[in-house]
């Protein structure tokens, strides 16, 4: 059996594990395809673009994790209108699962971890030193299992608005700040609203953790991460990028996540009276101790409340619908 045939055998087990999985690809860290396998679907999937997105999903957030001194990134979830791209680093390769979350969510963590075990073993045989121990392979597959499991777990947050009453319609920033203060679950370490240039509109530090990077620098880095992912996915058949989540950490007890999502468009006038429109993004750093469900639930509530203040936005509203759909699948 050739190297490619052997790899496709293991990719096939991932494809068969869920009816929602449409395509499984393996590429190097630059996005060069190594192997792939998929099933028939009405969704147009461009493998070259997906491998480019896989490479971006890890490189885009790299600076933030380095500045936070939180390593190594394990997995990322890139939610588009049509599918979610789940990307996992295996040594010097990237595995990407193209998954229709409307069909099934979350993924089976045990099944995926088992596939990771054999894939890492084979990749090391083919491209590594061949000297990796069984305990190292088990540690890796257990980290993937824990990250997948924890992201799909947690207490559901009721869908509600945090919009304050009687705010000043001429000055929306205080009302937006009040929304950020109104979250119901202490799940974020820090979170905020940023413009496309990385300028912080408002941000909150919650946990008091002594992080090596300030909140404004963190917010700017997170905004750049989201913009890079948006640029890479421009004109994609997958639809608009609705949410990007990256998970990093040494073990399951120390997993941290970065979430970035669209948060509408802020309309304002400059000093000369010219009307301007600025895209707003929501960014957050969180611990996975509480699971991923409350994180995306609180993010949705904050973003929904901000839209009530600054006005509707189609892409952001699709994010809200996606979160509602995912959580309803989880609790069916």
Please state what every model-predicted region is.
Residues 2-21, 29-188, 197-332:
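Acidic, low-complexity cytosolic segments
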């Amino acid at each position: 059996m050739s190297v490619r045939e052997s790899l496709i055998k293991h990719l096939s087990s991932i494809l068969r594990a869920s009816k929602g999985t449409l395509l499984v690809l393996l590429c190097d860290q630059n996005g060069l395809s190594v192997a792939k396998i998929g099933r028939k679907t009405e969704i147009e999937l461009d493998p070259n673009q997906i491998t480019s997105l896989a490479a971006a999903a890890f490189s885009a957030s790299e600076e933030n994790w380095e500045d936070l001194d939180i390593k190594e990134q394990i997995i990322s979830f890139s939610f588009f209108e049509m599918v979610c791209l789940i990307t996992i680093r295996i040594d010097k390769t990237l595995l990407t699962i193209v998954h229709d979350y409307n069909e099934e969510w979350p993924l089976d963590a045990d099944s995926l971890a088992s596939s990771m075990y054999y894939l890492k073993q084979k990749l090391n045989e083919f491209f590594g030193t061949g000297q990796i121990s069984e305990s190292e392979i088990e540690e890796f597959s257990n980290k993937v299992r824990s990250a997948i499991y924890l992201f799909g777990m947690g207490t559901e947050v009721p869908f509600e608005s945090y919009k304050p009453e009687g705010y000043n319609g001429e000055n929306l920033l205080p009302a937006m700040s009040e929304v950020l203060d109104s979250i119901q679950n202490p799940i974020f370490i820090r979170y905020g609203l940023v413009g496309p240039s990385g300028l912080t509109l408002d941000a909150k530090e919650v946990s008091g953790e002594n992080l090596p990077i300030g909140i404004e620098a963190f917010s700017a880095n997170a905004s750049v991460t989201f913009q890079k992912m948006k640029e890479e996915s421009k004109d994609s058949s997958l639809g608009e990028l609705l949410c990007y989540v990256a998970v990093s950490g040494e073990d399951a007890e120390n997993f941290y996540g970065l979430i970035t999502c669209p948060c509408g468009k802020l309309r304002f006038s400059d000093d000369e009276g010219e009307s301007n429109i600025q895209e707003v993004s929501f960014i957050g750093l969180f611990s996975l101790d509480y699971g991923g469900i409350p994180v995306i639930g609180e993010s949705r509530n904050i973003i929904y409340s901000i839209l009530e203040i600054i006005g509707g936005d189609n892409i952001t509203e699709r994010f809200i619908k996606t979160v509602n759909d995912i959580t309803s699948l989880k609790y069916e």
